[in-house]
Amino acid sequence: LASSAASDVYKRQSPASIVRFCRKLEYEGYNDFKIALAAQLQYSRLSNDDINANYPFKGTDSVYTVASNIANLSKESIDITMKNLDLEELRLVVLMITKAKVIDIYGVSGPLRIASDFQYKMFRIGKDVRISQMINEQLFQAAQSTSEHLAILISYSGETEEVIEAAKILYRRKIPAIAITSFGENRLVKYTQRVLYLNSSEFIYSKIATFSSTLSLHSVSYTH
């Protein structure tokens, strides 16, 4: 199913039934569902941990259990990121970061907050990293970018409309761009030159989502 085209699935079930099923699971449609399924299958092959990445602790857990689960989750996320890391891709990403005079971060909500840590680390080594919190500011930023800029676009699903809109502007202007996204086909990777993949243990629509995997990828990029 994860590798099946929508047209193949629709031969066995009506399109309306498939869409209803996907939306019942809180996905926008079949493609979103397929991306999440492929990502989760990839994670399942690599992970032996019983910790739920979306809800790593319960209200009844002790302080030690909470701290231990978060520590183990962060370690596992970094380990899985390293296992999945394409070293040649990382080398090319680092070259792009080194060459750029200005690095612009694009995304919404949580990933932007985590990107602030990356911004601070890069500031310490003399790199100009800019983060606009408002979507309209990001679109203006994309429209004003030059060849001296590098765009890093963060979207776990690779289908975040605001990020896709910025990616299209950057693509038309031929601005170098890197995607940070989950495994599987998605629209975002079509508009970027390089891709770094996230650990897929955190589901797209989770309440405690993507903090450890995004942070680990930022950290890997910073330290190489």
Where are these regions (language model features)?
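HTH-adjacent hinge/linker in prokaryotic transcriptional regulators
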Residues: 12-13, 17-88
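Conserved adenylation A10 loop of the ANL superfamily
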Residues: 223
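Short, hydrophobic-biased amphipathic alpha-helical segments
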Residues: 74, 216-220
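Single conserved hydrophobic/aromatic residue that forms the stacking wall/gate
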Residues: 1-6, 10
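Glycine-rich phosphate/diphosphate-binding loops that line cofactor/substrate pockets in enzymes
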Residues: 89-100
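Glycine-rich phosphate-binding loops that contact phosphosugars or nucleotide phosphates
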Residues: 98-216
